[in-house]
Amino acid sequence: MELCVISTTTTVKAINPFLPSITRRVSSRLFQSDSVLQFGGRLKKPISRPLDMSCVSRKIGFFGDFMSHGGNFRLFAAASPAVETSVKEDKLPADLKVTETVQANSSVKLSVEVPEIVCEDCYQRVLTEFMKLSKVPGFRPKTRVPENIIVGFVGRQYVLRATVESILKRTLPHAMESVTGRALKDSIQIVSSFPDMEKAYSKLKTLSYEVVVDVVPELKWNPEDGYKNMKVVVELGDEIDAKKACERQLRQKYKSLGALKIVTERGLQVGDLAVVDISATTIDEDGSTGQAIPDAESKGFHFDTEEGNRLLPGFLDAIIGIRAGESKSFTLVFPESWKQESLRGQRAQFTVDCKELFYRDLPTLDDSLADKLLPGCTTLKEVEETLAKRCQEMEQEAKEQATDNAILEQIRKMVEVEIPQSLFEEQGRQFYGARLLEIQGNMKLNEDQLASLSSQKAVNEFLETQRESITNIIKQNIAVGDIFKRENLEFSTDELVKEVENSISEFKKHKQEFDEERVKDQVQEILEGAKVLEWLKDRAEIQYITR
């Protein structure tokens, strides 16, 4: 039940088990948020050189895009000849006219006009390729075939489509030269309809088309250089206090040794475990019943009363004394610090049905339980000391995590940047993929469930509901990268090589597929982030307060 959790906590992130030690530590701070997980996804890189032909066909996805518009283009795409030459080697017989229009969300529209002489040259190349590939009756292979015969043999419509494709594949790299160094890879989209281009070319023997491409977003700091002398307030919850955490862990381990017995002669008291059904509705200002609160509904919820301080304030007190089979209704107000903003300050009517009630029959806590509490220990003192050491390490890690989160959140608020749509979608899909892996790791999904969760509809819903969180993380990543460049920070090649090797060995150890270049990109970004956080913390004024 979403409501029955502590409302304000220090976030300790889940960590990708396949990343090495330094990578795990840093990536858990840099690339995760309260609502989405990211395992160090690399931001898109700008295209640093003009696209060549093979790059066009591989990266832009002509075929997939056009097939939705061009009827039987799938067959044509598979069989049509392609001229794969670099921009420098393939000099066009005339210049293209390219008009650049800046659009929202760091994108640029390129309106491309291809002269008739270029179109004719592409047409002749297509005919030549078909002559090489076709076995025309009455003509020897690879010999010159009259235009009307080869067109009739191949099919006029087929030649037309092949010519339009040839024009696109040949001219697009030249058209993209104006955004070389700024264009984000995998973001290029031809927005003109393929059938419309076919019709236009067949009538005019020239071709015009439009391309939209995302470019590296321009970052503005407000205030300028504000990140250099930040004042950061870090809120720490008492749940990360080493002493209290140690006490909680020891208590949990001790409770696990007790037997649960049914309560028969009394009502609920602190220390018991209750199985309850919970429902809640909002209360309007006029006192009337409002809408149900889905996140508060739970059937068969196992409520440990010793964890009552981690619930909605007043919830435990309201049900003390309830007996099995009884029902209680009561009103509570969500505090202003509640995690879900929409519920802050909201009055709500709760109904709790107690199904079962248990108490723990605990053994005497002495040295005889030491090994059961913590294998390898012989005394309670040894158990306490071992747990205390672990909790102190966890406290330090949680404190560092909270500090990094606070710094990243502050620099995010300092930057103004338009996020390209392709970048948002790429990062969002990475987050969703990580979320899906997490779900699969926690429960067994059947084929129908997996198909449903993997559907485009599910992904799109995730992107929409998590838009703010995804955008915030991207802003953090962009800000971190900008600081790294601005301040000329660097890390050694040895560090990079070592961490890449460690990451790859972990992937191999767990028999996970990986792309070595992508792993290198991820590790590089993580190391950059570590250097930036270290640099920022050395110059920031940091104050810690406990909630």
Curated annotation (Swiss-Prot):
Look up the record and give one Gene Ontology term from the biological process aspect.
Answer: protein folding
GO terms under cellular component: chloroplast; chloroplast envelope; chloroplast stroma; plastid
Keywords attached to this Swiss-Prot or TrEMBL record, sorted alphabetically, are: Acetylation, Chaperone, Chloroplast, Isomerase, Plastid, Rotamase, Transit peptide
The record places domain PPIase FKBP-type at 271-366
Listed Pfam families: Trigger_C, Trigger_N
Q: Which residues carry this modification: N-acetylalanine?
A: A78
Q: Which reaction does it catalyse?
A: [protein]-peptidylproline (omega=180) = [protein]-peptidylproline (omega=0)
E.C. numbers: 5.2.1.8
Please state which protein family the record places this protein in: Belongs to the FKBP-type PPIase family. Tig subfamily.
Summarize the protein's role.
Involved in protein export. Acts as a chaperone by maintaining the newly synthesized protein in an open conformation. Functions as a peptidyl-prolyl cis-trans isomerase.
Note what the entry says on domains.
Consists of 3 domains; the N-terminus binds the ribosome, the middle domain has PPIase activity, while the C-terminus has intrinsic chaperone activity on its own.
Protein's recorded name: Trigger factor-like protein TIG, Chloroplastic
Protein encoded by which gene: TIG
